Amino acid sequence: MKITKIEKKKRLYTLELDNTENLYITEDTIVHFMLSKGMIVNAEKLENIKKFAQLSYGKNLGLYYISFKQRTEKEVIKYLQQHDIDSKIIPQIIDNLKSENWINDKNYVQSFIQQNLNTGDKGPYVIKQKLLQKGIKSKIIESELQAINFQDLASKISQKLYKKYQNKLPLKALKDKLMQSLTTKGFDYQIAHTVIQNLEIEKDQELEEDLIYKELDKQYQKLSKKYDQYELKQRIINALMRKGYQYEDIKSALREYL
């Protein structure tokens, strides 16, 4: 068989043979086999050209996808599958990309953690879940997370949360809110407890009284439409306790309010 034409088509080339067979090949394929118009190829060489072209095309697709940002092995595999790359050659493409360090899940984890430390607000548990969803092995994630002390980040987040809620919640509710927020963000209980203790939050009696009377008035307006006397009083007490107010403070406020 003779090559009758090689023509560029966007990112690929068409290779035409005198037996009317047409192939899509990459530039790497042309270079690798030193293909040119008029070259004679036998069936074995043609099969090798086809296989190499598939691998080369798949690798180029992977490199194109990676060029926008760092990707995990799982993400690249999914991308190749979405672009109809033969599943039999995907492992070979991935191995090639990994051998050239285009895909490196360990480096991905390190970059992901560092970015979170610099600009994020997530603790190790949430980070691990996000990375597991990207197909990274648990062993790789845990190895990198264990090397990081998340207390400084937790401290920074707790200070931001404290400033946000310090004039809106009573002391107990404030501490509970900080603890809930930190653990929801993926920090473990011990780190969360330590950084909250380090804030040295003290009770502001004047603020507490102002907050409790505002909440008491709100609950009274809401509940007095349905209940009266003893039941109204008990429901107000329960509502305020759920908001983090102390029982004795509630009783004291009620004596003056009702």
Curated annotation (Swiss-Prot):
GO CC annotation terms, alphabetical: cytoplasm
Classification via InterPro entries: RecX_HTH_1st, RecX_HTH_2nd, RecX_HTH_3rd, Regulatory_RecX, WH-like_DNA-bd_sf
Keywords on record: Cytoplasm
A Pfam family assignment: RecX_HTH1
Keyword flag Cytoplasm: yes
Cellular location(s): Cytoplasm
UniProt key word ATP-binding: no
GO biological process per UniProt: regulation of DNA repair
Matches recorded under Gene3D superfamilies: Winged helix-like DNA-binding domain superfamily/Winged helix DNA-binding domain
NCBIfam families in the record: PRK14135.1
Similarity comment: Belongs to the RecX family.
Protein's job: Modulates RecA activity.
Protein name per its UniProtKB record: Regulatory protein RecX
Protein encoded by which gene: recX
